[in-house]
């Protein structure tokens, strides 16, 4: 299974003028890749993710997943937003099942499996208002992965969480990735998060958004953010931000 982003460009119309948001984005992922996308605010990271998800069909170029051209949402793509977007009137297990019936034994068993994977045992009958923000985001992760998507797209899913919760969810996500080998594309503003999670870091520049540099990250798992090798990768990423004039903008 491959994911191909081929020549993707995107324009927005603003009153009497047209603004280019993305310019000729090209990269490929193989099954089991974990790619993080990082860059200045406004460089089109989230727009690119929505295009890959099939949520935005007005663009130039092609998105090919497992040989199929993507023009709309499908089971091939799971998507996790910056906020969890749970239904407040549904329990944890009902939110994970979403439009599938828990009366179906297969669905019930799959939901139970994902409850265990994201470490929500004992909270199946709880409602969103009764659990923390971090737990709610774990529900969102389980919901997105229940249908076994070819690729999981994550748009800064931990950005609004405190440092301890974010660190915990990074471990949960890595555990899922190691177990399921789901291909992942993860948008973040956090350089350390990008290095900690992925095996490839795509650095984007802005106005219009384009790929500035792709850095391979071959650090073995589990990773330590205080290790010398981790800091060497961090230095490489920061050097690319400086060379591209990206460090002047908040990342």
Curated annotation (Swiss-Prot):
Residue ranges occupied by any ABC transporter domain in the UniProt entry: 3-231
Catalytic activity entry: ATP + H2O + aliphatic sulfonate-[sulfonate-binding protein]Side 1 = ADP + phosphate + aliphatic sulfonateSide 2 + [sulfonate-binding protein]Side 1
Binding site for ATP: 39-46
Compartments it resides in: Cell membrane
GO MF term list: ATP binding; ATP hydrolysis activity
InterPro entries reported for this sequence: AAA+_ATPase, ABC_transporter-like_ATP-bd, ABC_transporter-like_CS, ABC_transporter_ATP-bind, P-loop_NTPase
The keyword Translocase belongs to this UniProt entry's keyword annotation: yes
Keyword Membrane among record annotations: yes
Primary location group: membrane
EC assignment: 7.6.2.14
Gene3D superfamilies, sorted: P-loop containing nucleotide triphosphate hydrolases (3.40.50.300)
Any GO CC annotation of this UniProt entry: plasma membrane
Keywords: ATP-binding, Cell membrane, Membrane, Nucleotide-binding, Translocase, Transport
CDD domains: ABC_NrtD_SsuB_transporters (cd03293)
Topological category with respect to the lipid bilayer: Peripheral membrane protein
Alphabetized PANTHER family for the sequence: ALIPHATIC SULFONATES IMPORT ATP-BINDING PROTEIN SSUB (PTHR42788:SF13), TAURINE IMPORT ATP-BINDING PROTEIN-RELATED (PTHR42788)
Quaternary structure annotation from Swiss-Prot or TrEMBL: The complex is composed of two ATP-binding proteins (SsuB), two transmembrane proteins (SsuC) and a solute-binding protein (SsuA).
Homology family: Belongs to the ABC transporter superfamily. Aliphatic sulfonates importer (TC 3.A.1.17.2) family.
Function: Part of the ABC transporter complex SsuABC involved in aliphatic sulfonates import. Responsible for energy coupling to the transport system.
Name of the protein in its database record: Aliphatic sulfonates import ATP-binding protein SsuB
Organism: Bacillus cereus (strain ATCC 10987 / NRS 248)
Lineage of the species this protein comes from: Bacteria, Bacillati, Bacillota, Bacilli, Bacillales
